[in-house]
């Protein structure tokens, strides 16, 4: 479920084509990777999706009436644009951001930004706590195939503000997400949601609904149909 750029760093297109001949089927987690492989002349490709454990990733009890200011969480490192994220944070001093950086060395980008809390590599339960204390999942991406971050964000009922790249529309649509193509788009959409709680709650509700499509049970059904 690597983006094409990551695949091409490791393998030549000739190697990818050759390897595809030794398997019955290649399973991808997003249509953009399927299209990439099809364009290489590889036809034995099945498009599935990234699953989520809806029993563990659940919304907070006060999802629709969280007190205080709107909070935004940023998670994931693969094909993320942290410089652009830092710019967005700097332009929205009234919004608090949880920046889940994992092991990425990006602290210098957020130096002096008092509205950013940098979160290192933490246990899953602690990460879920930050998700449940947030309203919006911000995903500034250069590309994406299938994303654990996207699916868990939706399962915890977060409104999605995302780059319109890769396979993102396999997972989100206009009912639960704001699609962006520039830093100003991200800033504008976060401000719209921060100032319109009714719209924010509508996106949250639809994220929860859409997350059910990506449950482990549905993933098993998807794969079992492939094996028949």
Feature-to-residue mapping (PLM):
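Acidic anion/phosphate-binding donor-loop and adjacent secondary structure
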Residues: 38, 52-69, 83, 108, ...
């Amino acid at each position: 479920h690597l983006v094409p750029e990551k695949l091409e760093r490791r393998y030549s297109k000739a190697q990818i084509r050759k390897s595809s001949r030794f398997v019955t089927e290649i399973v991808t987690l997003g249509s953009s990777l399927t299209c990439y492989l099809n364009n290489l002349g590889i036809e034995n490709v099945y498009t599935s999706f990234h699953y989520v454990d809806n029993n563990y990733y659940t919304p907070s009890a006060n999802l629709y009436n969280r007190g205080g200011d709107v909070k935004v969480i940023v998670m994931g490192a693969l094909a993320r644009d942290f410089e652009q994220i830092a710019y967005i944070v700097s332009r929205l001093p009234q919004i608090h951001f949880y920046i889940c950086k994992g092991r990425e060395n990006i602290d210098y980008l957020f130096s002096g930004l008092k509205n950013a809390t940098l979160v290192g590599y933490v246990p899953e339960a602690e990460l879920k706590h930050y998700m449940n204390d947030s309203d919006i999942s911000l995903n500034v991406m250069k590309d994406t195939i299938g994303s654990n971050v996207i699916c868990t964000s939706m399962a915890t009922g977060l409104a999605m503000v995302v780059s319109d790249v890769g396979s993102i529309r396999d997972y989100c649509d206009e009912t639960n997400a704001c699609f962006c193509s520039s830093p100003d788009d991200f800033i504008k959409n976060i401000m719209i949601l921060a100032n319109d709680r009714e719209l924010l709650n509508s996106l949250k509700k639809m994220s929860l609904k859409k997350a059910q499509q990506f449950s482990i049970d549905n993933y098993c059904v998807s794969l079992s149909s492939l094996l028949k």
